[in-house]
Amino acid sequence: MGPSDHLFRREAGRMVATLTRIFGVHNLALAEDVVQDAFCRALEVWKFQGAPGNPSAWLMTTAKNRAVDILRHERRTRSQALEVLSMSKTSVDPE
């Protein structure tokens, strides 16, 4: 088991729990996904830049920022879909 495996085993559960508290239990799958994304990103970035001074904080910040980005995108997409639906209802010719 390498250092990245050890870090994952030590941090992943805690990160998912923290993100679930922040974003709600209804976003559990999102929390799991962004934790995986953060670890994948770490493997890519740290290979070239080296691990940061506080890898746990880096991972949590990366995962939290990714979750916020995804939720914003979903909210924006939902809002745009409702706007299009609203416009199509008002522009429908009754004939």
For each feature predicted by the language model, list its residue ranges.
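Hydrophobic-face residues of short alpha-helical interaction/recognition segments
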Residues: 15, 19, 59, 63-71
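A short, charge-rich alpha-helical start-of-domain segment used by transcription regulators
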Residues: 1-18, 23-24, 28-32
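Acidic active-site catalytic centers that drive phospho-/nucleotidyl reactions
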Residues: 32-33, 37, 69
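Key residue(s) within conserved catalytic/signature motifs
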Residues: 12, 51, 56-60, 78-84
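ATP/adenylate-binding site constellation spanning eukaryotic-like Ser/Thr protein kinases
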Residues: 12, 36, 64
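Glycine-rich active-site/cofactor-binding loop and its immediate structural neighborhood
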Residues: 95
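Sigma70-family region 2
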Residues: 36-55, 73-75
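Short, basic/polar amphipathic helix motif occurring as a linker/hinge flanking DNA-binding modules
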Residues: 70-92
